[in-house]
Amino acid sequence: MEPSTPPMRGLCTPSTPESPGSFKGVIDASLEGNSSIMIDEIPESDLPAPQVSTFPPTPAKTPKKQLLPNLMLQDRSNSLERCMEEDREHNPFLSSSDNQLLSRKKRKPTPPPSDGLYYVFRGKRIKKSFRPGTDLSTFKPKLLFADSAPSSSSDNPTSSVDLNDYSQIGILPPNLNSIGNKMFSLKSRVPSSSSGSFVAPPPQMRLPAYSSPQKSRSNTKDENRHNLLR
């Protein structure tokens, strides 16, 4: 197979419209035919489409003086700088505190307007409204247990005891059972004493004497020894 020689420069070589060599051949042929032709006379249809760059545009390298012309760069080493002037009109730290600093006041919450009463039942706030003109001062809330329990009766002796009468504290009613009456009679015999001193109970309330476990064990040992000697 013979090696193919590359085409000569300046000659139009056949190529496909998609290949970049077609546009190069058109320009070379036009330059050879008329050397005084200008590039501007080439129709735009023959120019290649500009390639779209996928990279972000590079920032313009513009000096800061042109970007911010109003910004004045001052030399901090210059000792002849103009000192800052105090603005006494808008500076609260340089003026009187009575005019600028206001005293803090606690906000008093205003109660919402209401034309009824509020109840709290099982953690929920319930409002009960009344007709306008109703005197709420005479209104009494309903009792939680308006009716008495069925087990209670009027024969209960404690129902007649006044809880506000402190003189009745410690006195048992006489119509209790026999044990209560006995304890009530023994209580009346005990002399009154201060709360700090100890008073021995009467003989009727004392426990009967009993033998200690050590003494009972020693008695059983002696009995067993006596039985063995027999």
Swiss-Prot record:
GO molecular function terms attached to this record: cyclin-dependent protein serine/threonine kinase inhibitor activity
Subunit structure: Interacts with cdc13, cig2 and pop1.
Bias type Polar residues, positions: 93-102
Chain residue ranges for the region called Disordered: 1-25, 43-118, 188-230
Effect caused by changing residue 19 to E: Reduces activity as a cdc2 inhibitor
Ranges where the record places region Required for activity as a cdc2 kinase inhibitor: 101-230
A biological process from GO: positive regulation of proteasomal ubiquitin-dependent protein catabolic process
Low complexity bias: start-end ranges: 188-199
Name of this protein: Cyclin-dependent kinase inhibitor rum1
Induction: Expression increases in nitrogen deprived environment, which is important to cause delay of the G1 phase of the cell cycle in response to nitrogen starvation.
Purpose of the protein: Regulator of cell cycle G1 phase progression. Ensures the correct sequence of S phase and mitosis in the cell by acting as an inhibitor of the cdc2 mitotic kinase. Probably interacts with cdc2 to inhibit its action until the cell mass for Start is reached. Determines the length of the pre-Start G1 period and prevents mitosis from happening in early G1 cells. Required for maintaining pheromone-induced G1 arrest. Acts as an adapter protein since interaction with cdc13 promotes cyclin proteolysis during G1.
Species for this entry: Schizosaccharomyces pombe (strain 972 / ATCC 24843) (Fission yeast)
Gene name as annotated: rum1
Effect of residue 58 to A: Reduces growth rate into small colonies containing many elongated cells. Phenotype enhances due to increased stability. No reduction in 32-P incorporation mediated by MAPK
Biased composition (Basic and acidic residues): 78-91, 219-230
